[in-house]
């Protein structure tokens, strides 16, 4: 059996297992036991961010990452299909000092108008990956914001806004606790981390696995789907 077939079988097993009463009765251990009994790797990593994130999916991304760029629009479309009981957040992976400016700029633009974030993403990806501007230089994101119509005065004011600094610190804590070292990563319900590499770069399986783990969280946490 090839590695890709093994991955596909594992994801299918997780999806089917989540709907199984026996697996539901075992709780979180059921997923791990199922993987262990099959002598296969688990296409997710367990983390413990705490109950505050039990209804949240976070995408950790960075603008120098070509896979983040390739998946960005698809990820946002997928997020729009999630049950209303699940909250989706996208945030730069502030895993060290070089990424602080990126995170600060992202949250500043979100504070000004969250509706323009997709355009800010697109411009930032372009500047960093096509124009070779530095991903760690604050001027890169100031230019991205200006190019999408954000007034420089508004941008600078948002950058200095204390709650923005707090969001950056929260971002750093989340990425640290989740052990993020690859992007894009999905942190699902504060319990699981997956990447496209978890499923051998198969984007379809990536989102299927994310849906399966999100469904498991809804069941485990008794989150009510409010979608009409």
Regions found by a protein language model. Give the residues of each.
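Sec-exported extracytoplasmic/periplasmic mature domains
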Residues: 70, 76, 80-84, 107-114, ...
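C-terminal cap of thioredoxin/glutaredoxin-like
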Residues: 147-228
